[in-house]
């Protein structure tokens, strides 16, 4: 099916002048003296070189821009990120949705600022598909801001880099009025699923100390398939059809921590392994590593296996980038978590631990909507209506829960007061997924190797 679709759309792409990839685009390079700018400053800007994509046709919006923003890495070293600002038709300049995509790759040319452009590489399908989640935000009249939160080194799974980038992107958006017409006192809600929840969650947790001035702008954060322990996700997916997530994660960590890379490289006979880890976007990474065991079993790539975590340097990297371990970092803004009980990719146990950590620390408003009937893949769709309802309520000024509330429902489609138009929009997407024949039980993340090869077609059907 995927090959047939690619054949059919090839003539469309043949006539395109493709957007320049970040690795070859000088716009992504920091200007001289950039380190003297304050974090969140706009260093340069431009209209997106190509239209924002709605799949294989440009999205109907009012305008879109890219901002080059001063940020910093995990160690406080100055760097730059690009953030994409999308203005819908009939936009409300007082409302911003900061949407963090699940890029999940250690390759610069997978960045959302590139992937969201019409004509971007087919390996960025997954990010293009997330426009299905962003579109309802635009329909509400919200500006959508989507940062390249992994930064110039593509540091997938790295917490501080990601969270700081999200906050600096928001700072820049609030300063962009002369370019975008966004008000400097605009209200902001953050949203992310899976890898995007990692970035959004770290942003929410870091905000009180890193960007306290945003406290008056931020209305809350919605975190779905919430990643708080990168090791747990690696253990859940290693050796499975989703093992490519482990490869991409190892590449992302290695991009930020050279010593991490050196230690693991010395633990394998496959000396080119890290050269491959940063060569894939999410979908082609998953396809390339189906069933590969990196740290598990008798035929693992890294000889020490999971005992590598006993190395103090490796253990510290893992702990420093797991939000579940950062008990001192507690959001001051309202937070909404939604997660599937039977998630086999991001096990819910560490999400529950993080929820409890924040509750024990006295968080003012934390709502946890647990979905009993969906795993990671399908909760991205079935949980979205609840997240959107919560986001709309924040912009409408409705009351949040007081303290902590954890409710398990059979499905998060049962969340109160979901608009019927939003529910039907996502039910249609779910019907498409369930009829693709991805495996024994896609709602439980049970996907076959053959099913993985069909995943590329999901984006085609959605968009």
From Swiss-Prot:
Pfam families: LIP. Disulfide bonds join 110-281, 359-404. Induction: Cold-activated. Expression is induced in medium containing Tween 40 as the sole source of carbon. Expression is up-regulated during the yeast-to-hyphal transition. Expressed during experimental infection of mice. Expressed in host cecum and infected mucosal tissues (stomach, hard palate, esophagus and tongue). Expressed at all stages of mucosal and systemic infection. Glycans are attached at residue 229. The active site is at 194 (charge relay system), 343 (charge relay system), 376 (charge relay system). SUPFAM superfamilies: alpha/beta-Hydrolases (SSF53474). The keyword Disulfide bond applies. Transmembrane segments: none annotated. InterPro entries: AB_hydrolase_fold, Lipase_secreted. It catalyses: a triacylglycerol + H2O = a diacylglycerol + a fatty acid + H(+). It is an enzyme of class 3 (hydrolase). Its EC number is 3.1.1.3. Residues 1-14 form the signal peptide. Keywords: Disulfide bond, Glycoprotein, Hydrolase, Lipid degradation, Lipid metabolism, Secreted, Signal, Virulence. One of its GO terms (biological process) is filamentous growth of a population of unicellular organisms in response to starvation. It is found in: Secreted. GO terms for cellular component: extracellular region. One of its GO terms (molecular function) is triacylglycerol lipase activity. Belongs to the AB hydrolase superfamily. Lipase family. Class Lip subfamily. Secreted lipase that is able to hydrolyze both the neutral triacylglycerols and the monopalmitate ester Tween 40, allowing the use of hydrolyzed products as carbon sources. Exhibits a preference for the short and medium chain length p-NP (C4 and C8 acyl group) esters rather than the long chain length p-NP esters (C12, C16 and C18 acyl group). Has broad lipolytic activity, which may be important for colonization and subsequent infection, therefore contributing to the persistence and virulence in human tissue. This is Lipase 5. It comes from Candida albicans (strain SC5314 / ATCC MYA-2876) (Yeast).
